Design a protein with these regions (language model features):
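Conserved N-terminal beta1-alpha1 strand-loop-helix module at the mouth
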Residues: 1-88, 160, 247-261, 265
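Conserved, mostly hydrophobic/aromatic
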Residues: 21, 58, 92, 118, ...
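Conserved anion-binding
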Residues: 26-27, 93, 97-184, 202
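Short, acidic/polar
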Residues: 35-51, 100-109, 128, 165, ...
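Active-site-adjacent beta->alpha loops and helix N-cap segments on the catalytic face
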Residues: 67-82, 98-102, 122-137, 187-198, ...
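A C-terminal functional module that forms or caps the active site or interfaces directly
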Residues: 187-233, 237
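C-terminal helical cap(s) of enzyme catalytic domains, especially alpha/beta-barrels
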Residues: 218-229, 236, 240-266
């Protein structure tokens, strides 16, 4: 059985792509106050079809499916079957509970929905991580230094001789026994990317914040890919690009991918 981090690294090399397309299917993104779940389904499949050969991974944010209740969960099941197994699919769930609850979340995300990896919050410690890393073929990306403005309120708090995000990075290295642990590090904090990479050798980074949030693509690629792989997540800027056509979505994705390749001479 291949460890998740090996599989991710091999797929990045095979596709020459560090692109992760975020599937944050916001009804307002289609420009109508009357958007239905069927409208969003159709657009989601359009995004997937337009970028499938360009992306190493897709990252559905579960909140945009959960808002529709049982119909949203059915849509998520259908979408996972539609995507198939030729790309990596990361469930952006940000789970963070412990014990039996964490086990149920892991079963739901890995066994039922069949995600290849998920995002997790480390706030409750290793008890909230352990159930998700038992299967080395499944990966986790742990929130370390996120891209949102208020991240500094907690993640930049002093801990010992560093900051909380430093401590999280060091813990993630310890937790990476099965080579299936990665970190979420936002593109809006390029200095922190470099700092965290100096600690977390070999751990993959999932880097959100490019596009609508104004993150630094160049530094994300340069620093994130030192001694490890960086997966660059782009959501709204691709999914709701231009006139929302397949051509517009694909051209935007190709442009981002071209920029990434140029930055690291891939």
């Amino acid at each position: 059985m291949e460890a998740f981090n090996f599989r991710l690294s091999n797929m990045i090399k095979a596709k020459r792509s560090h692109l992760c397309v975020g599937l944050d299917m916001n009804p307002e993104g289609l420009g109508s106050s009357n958007t239905t779940i069927e409208d969003l389904k159709a657009h989601t499949y359009k995004v997937i079809d337009s970028t499938y050969d360009l992306a190493t991974a897709f990252k559905p944010n579960l909140g945009f499916f959960e808002r529709w209740g049982s119909a949203g969960f059915k849509w998520l099941e259908e979408m996972m079957a539609y995507i198939g197994e030729d790309v990596i699919v990361i469930g952006d769930a940000k789970r963070g509970d412990i014990g039996n609850t964490a086990k149920q979340y892991a079963h739901s995300l890995f066994k039922h929905f069949k995600f290849d990896a998920v995002t997790l919050s480390p706030y409750m410690g290793v008890d909230s991580i352990s159930p998700f890393v038992e299967d080395l073929s499944k990966g986790v990306f742990i929130l370390c230094r996120t891209s949102n403005p208020s991240a500094i309120d907690i993640q930049d708090q002093p801990v010992g001789e560093g900051f909380l995000f430093d401590k999280i990075a060091k813990l993630c290295v310890e937790w990476n026994v099965n080579n299936n642990v990665g970190l979420v590090v936002g593109a809006t904090a390029p200095e922190e990317i470099s700092r965290i990479r100096s600690v977390a050798f070999g751990l993959p980074f999932l880097i959100p914040g490019i596009g609508a949030q104004g993150g630094d693509l160049k530094q994300s690629m340069l620093q994130g890919n030192k001694n490890g792989d960086a997966l660059i997540n782009i959501s709204r800027s691709i999914s709701f690009s231009g006139n929302l056509s397949e051509k517009s979505i694909r051209e935007t994705a190709k442009d981002y991918l071209s920029q990434m390749r140029d930055i690291i001479n891939l």
